[in-house]
Every structure is written in C-alpha cells, then in structure tokens.
C-alpha cells in the first residue's frame, strides 16, 4: 500500500501536533526561545534539520560536510538529482557557516534561525566552485552520514582547539567511510584535508593515528576524480606535504607509516598537474631513498606506485603535452626517471627480498620494459639471475617463474644466446 505525499505529511504533522516531542532552545543573539519538533517534519522542499532533530527513515538527506548542516525532504524516486555535490568547497572562510554562529549575524534579528541557516548555505553554495557531473548517492544510510558528521566534527575540534582525545575513533571511522565517493569529495575540502595533514605532521599524535590519516587521504582520492579535482584547484600543496612526510618517516624508520603515505601519494599522482609538481620537488629522489632504506613492504608499495604512475603510457602522453619549467629542465624527464627505477629494480631483485615483494618489483620492471622499452638498460647481473631458474624459483615462487617464462623472449631477449643456455629452463 502506497501513501501519498500529502497523507504522509498529514500523518507526521498529526503525530507531532500533540506537542509531546518538542525541543526548545534560546537563540544566543536575541535571547528568544524557539521551538521545533523533535522528529523532523518533511515537505517536498529542502529544509534545514536541527542538530538534535531525529530524521525519519526514507527521506532524501544532503549535508554540508564542512559544518555538518543537514537538509532533508521527502524522497521522490522520479526526481532528477542535480549533478552537484552538496559538500561545501574551500572558498568560504573558516567559521562563516558554522551553525552555532548563524544566529549572531548582524542585521538578522527578525529572521528565524532556520532561515539564517538556509541563507548561509545558499550563500556558501553560490560562492563555491562545485564540481559538476557528480550525483550524490541517495542510498547512503543516514547512520553513515551521522557517523561521518561526528568524525569530521572531531577533526575540526582537533584543528581549532587542539583536542585529540577523539581522533583515534574518528580516524578509524573516516578511513572506513572515505571509500564512498560522496565522503571522499567531502574530505577533499580544505578544512578536513588540512586537519588530516596536520595530524601527519604533529609530533604529539601517535603513529597509528597518522597511519589512519594517511589511509583516509588515499582512500578519499583513489578512483575519485571529483575529489582529486577539488584538491588540485585548492591552495593545498598535497604532493609537497606527502613528500615531506615521507622524508620524515624515512628518517624515523616508521615503515608502516611510510607504506600508508606511499598509498596516499599514489592516489594523488593521477594527473599531469600532480605529476608536474612531483617533478618540481624531485619526488623520485625521495622515493628512491625510501626504497633503499625501507622495509620489504615499503619497497613493494613504492614499486607498485611506479607501475601505476610512471609506467602508464596514457598519463605519460598527458604529461608530455605540458610546457614550462619542468620541460625546460629536462625534456626527457619521464624516460630518465624510468631508467633510474629500472636500474634500482634490477639491482634489488637478486637481493634478499620476500617472494611477494619480488613479484611486485618484477611486475613493475616488466611494465616499464613493455611500455617504455628504451628506458630499460638490461644489466648482466639481472640476466644472470633470470638465467638461474632453480635459484630464482626458490626466491620468488612458481607463479612468478611462469610469468618470467612468458616474458623472457619478448622482454629480455633470447636466453639461448647467452652462456647459460644449457641451463635455461624458463
């Protein structure tokens, strides 16, 4: 049985008419008492939801993730959702639309608090550069929205007041929720992103919290071009921040944190703009230093980043179209960088690495060779390692031995032309 919208409104309003569940509060500026239902009463238009109101199930809810202000209305399944994310971007000054301060704006004494919040949100949306093309997911549970709002509030409390007691719980929640595209877009706003970066740089914050902050950044941006665009168009120099944090974690031998930071950096280096910044900051040198001194897991993470970023022809072609300081310094930077990495990987494969990491390193090296053949100068030491299959099999496992066998002639030349041809079983 389907209820009409009119009947639904009548039922909700009738239930509240008894006045049993009403919330009253005093406005800070005017001292006037205002009252509203404990359970939000929806209409067909967007209305602001007070922080302590209960939102009935089945409504269409949207939220300004920077300050936690929510709006809701009756969900119309036939309605076309506008192609914008409601999350507020980076241009509104901090604190301008915080809900607690909205009742204190000058010249607004005759306007209700609800209307003030509406005006503030409308003003914020007009002043934002909101990314077109993303339709907010209406199927995200309200409980997730509430959890996210509370976690972002904990970030804000840390950034503004230095309160870190709730960070571990908040970061754990954000790490889990940041895989959702809508929440990833929200976390790419300047304030939450800067709070996460501040956590990474704060010597007083424990390593586990820093790891969760790095993973949250990475998950927010991975496969989320809308979020990445917001970061690129903001004033946050995320590439520099992550490279600086990586250099520091390398000095401190904090390998688990380094691995998480590499994960975050790999999510950022997906556009010509971010790769250009990586070049400007000599990011390859930072990663090579990390690779040489880091744990097996760090080496695996770095090799995967190189495969996903530098060994990708499409991104290389986009980068090649960029002119300016980067190209003036080195017209062949990309190829030179790949030569450096192919040498690093060839030298490390015969060394004592776990079979899992050797598989990642070899896969990255093979991708470079396959897509940028001239960027790999094959070394004798590496070929000797390839030409001792029994030794290689003991080090890398049967699966990678099979892969090398498939690649041998195509990527590394004819093994029978070498002195180990009689022993070549690959």
From Swiss-Prot:
A motif (Prevents secretion from ER) lies at residues 423-426. Residues 1-17 form the signal peptide. This is Nucleotide exchange factor SIL1. Required for protein translocation and folding in the endoplasmic reticulum (ER). Probably functions as a nucleotide exchange factor for the ER lumenal chaperone KAR2. It is not required for viability but is essential for optimal growth at elevated temperatures. Interacts with KAR2. The gene is SIL1. Gene3D superfamilies: Leucine-rich Repeat Variant. GO terms for cellular component: endoplasmic reticulum; endoplasmic reticulum lumen. Keywords: Endoplasmic reticulum, Protein transport, Signal, Translocation, Transport. The keyword Protein transport applies. Induction: By the unfolded protein response (UPR). InterPro entries: ARM-like, ARM-type_fold, Hsp70_NEF-Inhibitors, Sil1_fungi. Its main location: endoplasmic reticulum. Belongs to the SIL1 family.
């Amino acid at each position: 049985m389907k209820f009409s919208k009119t009947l639904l409104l009548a039922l909700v309003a009738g239930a509240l008419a008894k006045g049993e569940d009403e919330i009253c509060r005093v406005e800070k500026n005017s001292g006037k008492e205002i009252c509203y239902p404990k359970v939000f009463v929806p209409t067909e238009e967007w209305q602001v939801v007070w922080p302590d109101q209960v939102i009935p199930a089945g409504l269409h809810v949207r939220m300004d993730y920077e300050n936690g202000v929510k709006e809701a209305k009756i969900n119309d399944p036939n309605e076309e959702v506008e192609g914008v994310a409601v999350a507020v971007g980076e241009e509104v000054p901090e604190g301008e639309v915080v809900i607690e301060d909205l009742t204190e704006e000058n010249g607004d004494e005759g306007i209700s608090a609800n209307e003030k919040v509406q005006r503030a949100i409308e003003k914020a949306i007009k002043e934002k550069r909101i990314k077109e093309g993303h339709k907010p997911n209406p199927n995200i549970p309200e409980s997730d929205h509430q959890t996210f709002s509370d976690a972002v509030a904990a970030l804000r409390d840390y950034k503004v007041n230095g309160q870190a007691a709730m960070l571990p719980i908040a970061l754990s929640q954000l790490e889990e929720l940041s895989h959702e595209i809508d929440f990833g877009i929200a976390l790419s706003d300047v304030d939450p992103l800067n709070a996460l970066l501040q956590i990474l740089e704060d010597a007083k914050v424990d390593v586990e919290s820093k790891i969760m902050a790095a993973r949250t950044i990475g998950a927010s941006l991975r496969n989320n071009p809308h979020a990445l665009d917001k970061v690129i168009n903001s004033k946050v120099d995320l590439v520099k921040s992550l490279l600086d944090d990586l250099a520091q974690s390398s000095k401190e031998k904090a390998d688990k944190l380094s691995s998480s930071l590499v994960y975050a950096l790999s999510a950022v280096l997906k556009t010509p703009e971010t790769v250009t910044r990586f070049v400007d900051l000599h990011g390859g040198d930072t990663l090579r230093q990390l690779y040489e001194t880091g744990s097996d897991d760090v080496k695996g993470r770095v090799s995967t980043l190189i495969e996903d970023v530098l060994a990708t022809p499409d991104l290389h072609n986009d980068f090649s179209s960029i002119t300016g300081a980067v190209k003036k310094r080195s017209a062949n930077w990309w190829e030179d960088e790949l030569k450096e990495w192919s040498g690093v990987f060839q030298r490390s494969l015969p060394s004592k690495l776990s079979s899992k990491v050797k598989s990642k390193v070899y896969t990255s090296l093979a991708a470079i060779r396959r897509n940028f053949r001239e960027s790999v100068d094959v070394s004798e030491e590496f070929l000797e390692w390839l030409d001792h299959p029994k030794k290689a099999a003991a080090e890398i496992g049967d699966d990678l031995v099979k892969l090398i066998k498939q690649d041998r002639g195509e990527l590394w030349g004819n093994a029978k032309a070498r002195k180990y041809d009689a022993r070549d079983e690959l």
